[in-house]
Amino acid sequence: MDFTKKILVVFAFTIMLGISSVHCRPSFKPIPLFGEKLTQCFDTRPCLQGMLKCIEFCSSMGTADGQCNNENLCCCTHE
């Protein structure tokens, strides 16, 4: 009787460990390759005021450069 309780406890812990490892898996974020720059686009508000406002916005975010794209989104480039 005691042996089956131990097996049941080990089985329960194995299931709990399996479930926790599935739920706690870190999200995959691609790392830019050497020389490749990461670009992140934001809303249109800075670009409505001109390219300089987009550059100022991106500088305040701590990025290297900012440009308005064809959709008038302010895109910041990370180095």
From Swiss-Prot:
Its main location: secreted. The keyword Transmembrane helix does not apply. The keyword NADP does not apply. Residues 1-24 form the signal peptide. Keywords: Antimicrobial, Disulfide bond, Fungicide, Plant defense, Secreted, Signal. One of its GO terms (biological process) is defense response to fungus. GO terms for cellular component: extracellular region. It is found in: Secreted. It comes from the Eukaryota. Disulfide bonds join 41-76, 47-68, 54-74, 58-75. Belongs to the DEFL family. This is Defensin-like protein 109. It comes from Arabidopsis thaliana.
